[in-house]
């Protein structure tokens, strides 16, 4: 794993105070690789919105583009001169804040390693 996926993990640790890999890689219909069906809860919606955000990125690969950011107070400020990399940073920043803001509705008993048949509905548009 390289580029922004490592940076995304770091942001999640900073803002949500938990590992993105361990908490969000296999959650709901959208957290982790791919995504199908309808978001199952607010945390899964964070991942859906993040996937949509990555889908709108042009001129760089959001999974490998390395961006710059600074930590200020308890937040993240995206920087740099490359508009594409800055957009990737913003996608990650918004998702990490979303995870933080929805920790109280996270339900591992219900949505961790959700069977694929639970994610068969037609997806909503981004």
From Swiss-Prot:
Protein name: Acidic phospholipase A2 S1E6-a
Keyword Lipid metabolism attributed: yes
Superkingdom assignment: Eukaryota
Major localisation: secreted
Binding site for Ca(2+): 30, 32, 34, 51
GO CC terms of this entry: extracellular region
Record function comment: Snake venom phospholipase A2 (PLA2) that inhibits ADP-induced platelet aggregation. PLA2 catalyzes the calcium-dependent hydrolysis of the 2-acyl groups in 3-sn-phosphoglycerides.
């Amino acid at each position: 794993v390289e580029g922004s996926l490592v940076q995304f993990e770091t942001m999640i640790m900073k803002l949500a105070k938990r590992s993105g890999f361990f908490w969000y890689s296999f959650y709901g219909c959208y957290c982790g690789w791919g995504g199908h069906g309808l978001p199952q809860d607010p945390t899964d919606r964070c991942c859906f919105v993040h996937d949509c955000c990555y889908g709108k990125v042009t001129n760089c690969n959001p999974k490998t583009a390395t961006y710059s950011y600074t930590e200020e107070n308890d937040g993240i400020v995206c920087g740099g001169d490359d508009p594409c990399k800055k957009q990737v940073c913003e996608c990650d920043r918004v998702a990490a804040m979303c995870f933080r803001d929805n920790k109280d509705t996270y339900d591992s008993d219900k949505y961790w390693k959700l069977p694929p048949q639970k994610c068969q509905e037609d997806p909503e548009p981004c």
